[in-house]
């Protein structure tokens, strides 16, 4: 019987990333997946003869660090720095289109407002970018490296300048609805930006709890996967297999038996 250091149940993108990192540490890893293919919501399925799609249609803000660490480009992952357009549809045909730092389909004053908004938000996002992949140190009895992490964050916030620093602390407490109301008057533009800000948060536009931070996290990204999500899954799977990970599909887990505290 084969011995494994780690058994991972499920073969979604998070599981495949974990399996790759464990394999890089010379661990013997088994991944078991109940479905016929890997990927979870990112798996490609045929919903009609000749037509395939995944539930997850795009993987934005996939960390560049993971791409480099796992050398996913060598396994077929292609990236582009171009931001895909986000379109707010209007029944009258006057659609609003967002693409990076540009917006069309709105009056000139709204275009100017969006430029100011995007410039400020991108500045905040870039300021926070180095910290998204770091573990927040516990408060109290911190080691020197942990104290330095707090000091670095504090310094980067202070370097924003007094006015922008105050605006940052005020803004991160706002619901997205209030933030949009402060900057814009065009209802479709506000709806489009509000929707974009709340992706993945399970929050509503008027929800508090720092939903603006999720928007800043997404704005800190610099790439989108150019093809569909299954392309990312395929690259992760190929990378894992090349590192010796044993991936078994059609393998449903019925029980987890724990014996002798191991």
Regions found by a protein language model. Name each.
Residues 32-37, 208-214:
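Active-site-adjacent bridging/hinge elements
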Residues 73-75, 188-192, 242, 247-250:
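Acidic/polar loop patches that form or flank catalytic/metal-binding clefts of enzymes
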Residues 92-207:
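Rossmann-like flavin
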Residues 213-260:
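Helical element adjacent to the flavin cofactor pocket in flavoenzyme catalytic cores
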């Amino acid at each position: 019987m084969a011995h494994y250091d780690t058994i991972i149940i499920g073969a979604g993108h998070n599981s495949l990333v974990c399996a790759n990192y464990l394999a890089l540490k010379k661990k013997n890893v088994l991944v078991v997946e109940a479905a016929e293919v890997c990927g979870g919501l990112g798996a490609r399925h045929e919903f009609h003869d000749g037509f395939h799609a995944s539930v997850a249609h795009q993987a934005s803000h996939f960390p560049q660090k993971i791409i480099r660490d796992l050398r996913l480009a060598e396994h077929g992952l292609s990236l582009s720095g171009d931001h895909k357009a986000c379109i707010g549809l209007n029944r009258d045909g006057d659609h609003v289109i967002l693409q990076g730092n540009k917006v069309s389909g709105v009056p000139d004053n709204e275009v100017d407002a969006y430029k100011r908004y995007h410039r400020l938000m991108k500045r905040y996002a870039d300021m926070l970018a180095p910290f998204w992949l770091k573990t927040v140190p516990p408060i109290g009895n911190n080691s020197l490296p942990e104290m330095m992490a707090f000091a670095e964050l504090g310094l980067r916030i202070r370097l924003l300048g007094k006015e922008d620093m105050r605006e940052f602390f005020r803004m991160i407490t706002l619901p997205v609805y209030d933030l949009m109301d402060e900057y814009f008057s065009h209802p479709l533009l506000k709806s489009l930006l509000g929707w974009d800000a709340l992706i993945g948060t399970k929050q509503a536009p008027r929800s508090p709890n720092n939903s603006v931070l999720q928007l800043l996290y997404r704005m800190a990204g610099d790439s989108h996967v150019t093809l569909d999500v299954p392309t990312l899954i395929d690259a992760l799977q190929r990378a894992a297999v090349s590192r010796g990970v044993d991936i078994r599909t059609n393998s449903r887990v019925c029980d987890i038996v724990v014996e002798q505290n191991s």
